[in-house]
Each structure stands twice: as structure tokens, then as C-alpha cells.
Amino acid sequence: MELKFSCRGNVIALSFNENDTVLDAKEKLGQEIDVSPSLIKLLYKGNLSDDSHLQDVVKNESKIMCLIRQDKDIVNQAISQLKVPDYSTNTYSLKPKKPHTTPKPASIYTFNELVVLDYPHKDRALRYLERLRDDTGIKKIMDSHRWTVPLLSEMDPAEHTRHDSKTLGLNHNQGAHIELRLRTDRYDGFRDYKTVKSTLIHELTHNVHGEHDSSFWELFRQLTKEADAADLLGKPGSYVSDRASYTPQQDNDDEDQKNHRRDLLLAAAERRKQSGSKVQKE
């Protein structure tokens, strides 16, 4: 059995026997990347348990997402070295206390885990995903439709770019894992936020509809309107006859935004082509 592991921005191909378990895969992969198997987490349509046989949970030549946990000992050591300020001798001015408010509980309908590529500016990429996760419109969609996505990750542009097309996002197993292209094609920056947000709404639509048929586009437009309405409520606006009006600003100089529709259609055509080739092989 041949398997590919996407780990830290690299793809590692390894061979296994039919009776090998997920734990065997972690041990073999750990030797390749010099990481303890206990710190490795493997995802393929969800988390893979150590005692499962590979042939029962993955297909030959499957691509598996690899996540590396931080060593707890290293984290605890770093925390222990932090200096705690001594407030015992400080004098404070008396100020009225702020009213106590109970924070609103976090919604269970969200993206449980965010993963970025091991490229420069990882912190910016992570903040980008956090901004999408916490976006008012996206949160409204997730809550309204009761969607929970276990993993939202950054897509590697190098793996999904051809001379005639590029994939902006992928939805694996109807919402088990969503990938988004965050970086520009030249890796010199990040793509327009409104474009990536629209791509995320596009991929969330695939939680319900796999094909780009009329039902898909109807739901996509509905979700976009829901997100826009939620964004409007969170922004100051002008009201006429007790109704707010909000039109997203269009930037004619933004090449990503201008070509977003074209890119989505190209990505859809590519998926149909890949789907057709699989049917012919079978």
C-alpha cells in the first residue's frame, strides 16, 4: 500500500504492508521527519485511531493530513521561565469596578482546528484563518445551518495550480476538512480577503451539494446574502424607511476579486474533469 502524507508543507510518500496499523504509519513517518509518534496526528475523513488497520480506514495512494502537536514538556518549560510580576508592593488608584458581565458562550458550530503551511509569515496566515473563523457573516452561516467543520487549513498553491487553472478551495467529505488558498501565486503576499471569504462560502455550500448544479448556486447565493446581512448588522449604516442598505465595495483594480467568478468556474470544470476520469478508470 502506497500512502502520501502532507506534513509541514511537504508531501512524503511511504509504503506499508496490508496488516500495518495507523500506529505503524506514525512510527514510520516519525522516523522520516524526526518526530515522536506520540506527537503525530493523522487525519483522513476524520481522526485515525492508532489501532486501526490502514487497509480498513484509507485507500491505496490516499493523501493523509499530518498534524504535529507541540511537546508538552517544552511548553511547560517555557511557561515556567516566564516572569510573573510582583504586585504586592504596588499602589493602585481606586477606580469604580466595571459591571460584571457573563461572556457569551462560544458556539459549537465553528471550525475546530486551524492549520497553516510551514512557509514564511505563518503567523499572518494563522491570523487570516482566525479572521475567517470569527467573521460575523461566516459565524452566522455556521450557526444558522448548524455546521461544524473539524479542520480548516491553508491550501498549498503549488499542489493545485496548472497552466490553465487554479483551485481556490477544496471541501473534503462534505465538511470534514476545508482547504483555502490564502497566498498569492507568487507567494509574495496574501489574497484579497473578500475573495477568500467568498471561496469559503462556496466550499461551505459543498456541505450540502457536491455538484455545481442549480441547487448548488441557489444555496450559494442564499448563504452569501445571509453573510452580507449579518455583516450589515455589525456595521454602522444609513437607514431609509427603517431599512438598512449596504452594498459591498467593489475594487476594480483588484485582480483577484475581478477574476473570482472565472476562477470558481475553472475550478468547477477541473473537478468535473477529475470526476469523469475516475468514472472511466472504474
Swiss-Prot record:
Its main location: cytoplasm. Its EC number is 3.4.24.-. It comes from Schizosaccharomyces pombe (strain 972 / ATCC 24843). Keywords: Cytoplasm, DNA damage, DNA repair, Hydrolase, Metal-binding, Metalloprotease, Nucleus, Protease, Zinc. Zn(2+) binds at H202, H206, H212. Residues 99-274 form the WLM domain. The keyword Ribosomal protein does not apply. One of its GO terms (cellular component) is nucleus. Residues 269-282 have a biased composition (Basic and acidic residues). One of its GO terms (molecular function) is single-stranded DNA binding. Belongs to the peptidase M3 family. WSS1-like metalloprotease (WLM) subfamily. InterPro entries: Ubiquitin-like_dom (IPR000626), Ubiquitin-like_domsf (IPR029071), WLM_dom (IPR013536). This is DNA-dependent metalloprotease WSS1 homolog 2. It is found in: Cytoplasm; Nucleus. Residues 1-75 form the Ubiquitin-like domain. Residues 234-282 are annotated as: Disordered.
